[in-house]
A protein has these predicted regions:
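Glycan-recognition and catalytic cores of secretory/periplasmic carbohydrate-active enzymes
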Residues: 1-291
Length: 291
């Protein structure tokens, strides 16, 4: 449970958001990163902590909207497309056990799976295998489906994919000259692959995860401090494998690159080198979100 004062503030913000969301439309408005799928995830999180039925009621409305508009989505990926939406609906199913929803998810996962099978393993592109826009995010949606709805489903495919990831990481990290901010990032690079390995099998990938956490950290001067393109996403991976020593090092780097605004608030570096406060992907909100 949240403290009463904080709970009241959160509820007030959500009620304002309801008004805004019913009067405005946005690009990628159904997506996990920018739209209703992410909003649904938040509502379920708030309900699980507060047990306030209001959040679940909003979640019901949001899930219905996602289902009704699912076929309008053009992207397949985790951040903007169908994989992210299905992941949120899978989470929603855990709260409802609704059979109609289960059938919808079951009928929809095939398209994601087919796209996943069509990947060109010969390309070995870090971008193609990335979390936000590549195969890692799609694989995680398949993993969540098999974990919640059909145990052992996709097991062999995900095991093969896991082997591909290990080979890709070895190849990509053997040549550091071409590694820049995005190649090290969560959305398009190595940090996102590390996060997938953490969520897929943290214990089984313990040595690999630690190895590439150190690799990314050793190149942190090429990165900013935000979540999407910066080192904060690497900080999240240290929570999974309890790498406390590296966690402290990353925190020190983030704090060293920060500054105070006119109100004394701690600001973190965005991609532009400036301090961005209210942005999850490139600003301070991503750092807060990790905690």
């Amino acid at each position: 449970m949240y403290p009463p004062e904080l709970d009241s503030k959160i509820l007030s913000i959500i009620k304002k958001a309801v008004t805004i969301r019913t009067t405005h439309t946005y690009e990628y408005q159904y997506s996990l990163l920018f739209g209703d799928a992410g909003y649904l995830w938040l509502l379920l999180h708030l309900f699980s902590i507060s047990k306030n039925q209001y959040y679940l009621q909003l979640a019901n409305v949001t899930a219905k909207k996602l289902i009704e508009n699912y076929d309008t989505l053009e992207e397949i990926d985790f951040a903007l497309g169908k994989s992210g939406v299905l992941l949120s609906l899978i989470k929603y199913y855990q709260f409802t056990n609704d059979n109609t929803l289960k059938i919808f998810i079951h009928n929809s996962i095939g398209e994601i799976y087919h796209y996943f099978l069509q990947r060109d393993t010969a390309k070995e592109s870090i971008l193609d295998y990335s979390f936000a826009h590549g195969y890692c995010g799609i694989a995680y949606a398949l993993f969540a489906y098999s974990k919640v709805l059909e145990p052992s489903m996709f097991y062999n495919d995900l095991h093969t994919f896991h082997t591909e990831l290990k080979k890709l990481l070895e190849k990509v990290t053997s040549n550091t000259e071409n590694l820049g901010n995005l190649q090290l990032s969560w959305c398009k690079g190595i940090s996102g692959i590390i996060l997938y390995l953490c969520m897929y099998d943290c214990d089984g990938n313990k040595d690999i995860i630690s190895k590439y956490q150190e690799f990314v950290f050793n190149h942190h001067l090429k990165m900013m401090t935000g979540y999407c393109h910066g080192i904060t996403s690497l900080l999240q991976t240290t929570v999974y494998n309890q790498n406390k020593l590296l966690m402290e090092k990353i925190q020190q780097v983030i704090l060293a690159c920060s500054e105070r605004d006119d109100h004394g608030l701690l600001m973190f570096q965005g991609d532009s080198g400036k301090a961005d406060l209210f942005d999850f992907g490139i600003g301070s909100m991503g750092y807060i979100g990790v905690y």
